[in-house]
Amino acid sequence: GVHVVKTGYVNRLMDFKEAHDGQYGVRHYRKVIETAAKYQIAIDNHEPVMPTGIERTWPNLMTQEGVRGQEHNAWSPDGGNPPEHTTVIPFTRGLAGPMDFTFGTFNFTNEAYPGTRVNTTLCKQLALFVVIYSPLQMASDLPENYKGIKAFDFIKDVPTDWDKTYVVDAKIGDYSVFARKDRNTSDWYVGCITDENARELDVPLSFLDADSKYTAQIYADGDDAEWKTNPTSFKYGEKIVTASDTLHVKLATSGGCAIRFIKQ
């Protein structure tokens, strides 16, 4: 049978009565979650009311939107989410629980809506899988846009269930660096993102296990990457690191860096 349902609502008024965030909507959302729990169905709720921590009572609510997500880059007349958007929401909306932002796009323009685009580089899309927490993730692009691209390996590898989380460095609205440990393996993952400004960051690896070596699989913005003119440029490399090392990371404008650490 069906074990997971993603819900979504297209009308401004539910049943032509009240807005999603009215009392009618609040009762409806709660009823959906309770009924789904009865049948052991997990929910990914889009267009929800403000997150309140209800997943503590109903853990089948795996994740929900409740944020100006990446879909706004596809059609929003205001140009979509600005580059600094994802450097803010982990520290605001993210405090209220998991959010389904729907990142993972490799094709950055939308021919159906001329003038719209995803306002990041490819590597920032990868890094968001670490920066923004959701126990259910998706790859938001078409399958053909991933074919033959090494960067898709990171999306296939990155888990959604974490054992430890550290904010290694951040300035809200400018940049952030998150490190998370996979709950089911000894692997660590790091995501670094920046706003419209290119920047260089030093990432200390003190969160790794002492006296152990790791293979770092690094997906970084290319030297010529730029979110408006060359968002798909990236480079991949591997190196052996330990907890005493510090990685120097270069981020393009609205860029990112995604790293997987595999314990040897």
Model-derived features: positions:
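Conserved, mostly hydrophobic/aromatic
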Residues: 43, 131, 190, 254
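Generic beta-strand/beta-sheet core signal
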Residues: 5-10, 44-46, 191-195, 219-221, ...
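Acidic/polar loop patches that form or flank catalytic/metal-binding clefts of enzymes
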Residues: 6, 40-47, 72-74, 135-149, ...
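Glycan-recognition and catalytic regions of carbohydrate-active enzymes
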Residues: 141-189, 224-230
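Carbohydrate-binding surface patches
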Residues: 172-214, 258
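Solvent-exposed beta-strand/loop surfaces of large extracellular or lumenal domains
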Residues: 218-244
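Aromatic- and carboxylate-enriched substrate-binding clefts and catalytic-loop regions
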Residues: 1-111, 115-117
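C-terminal beta-strand-rich structural cap/linker in extracellular carbohydrate-active enzymes
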Residues: 237-264
